[in-house]
From Swiss-Prot:
One annotated GO biological process: regulation of nitrogen utilization
Function in brief: Could be involved in the regulation of nitrogen fixation.
GO molecular function, one term: ATP binding
UniProt name for this protein: Nitrogen fixation nifHD2 region GlnB-like protein 2
A Pfam family per the record: P-II
SMART domains listed in its UniProt record: P-II
GO cellular component: cytosol
PROSITE patterns: PII_GLNB_CTER, PII_GLNB_DOM
Organism from which the protein derives: Methanosarcina barkeri
Amino acid sequence: MKEITAIIRMNKAQRTKDVLLECGFPSFTIRRVMGRGKQRGLCHEFNPPLPDPEKEAETCIRFIPKRMFTIVVDDENVSEVVQKIIEVNQTGNAGDGKIFVSDVTEAIRIRTGESGEATVNKELV
């Protein structure tokens, strides 16, 4: 099993959710998060420039609101889910997001006590 964590633009969250549902992956968690990439957030240029260098630095280094999807799938579905997330979110611009894939050693369905890959299958149980 793998955990897929995708950090994406806020305006792409609904379409990402819709595509995952259409592909048969209805189980995921969405969180509101703040972050920034290598660009250190968006820089706003002011005309005229800000007279205080500290204020200018604060303006350029900020956190951007994002959405974080967490999806646990069996190994055979990782490529499909990752590809669908990329298709929806890739614009070619900085800030499109990141996807992380991690191993999951165990999953337990609290309601039934069931464990293993059966807890993350596509069928409704």
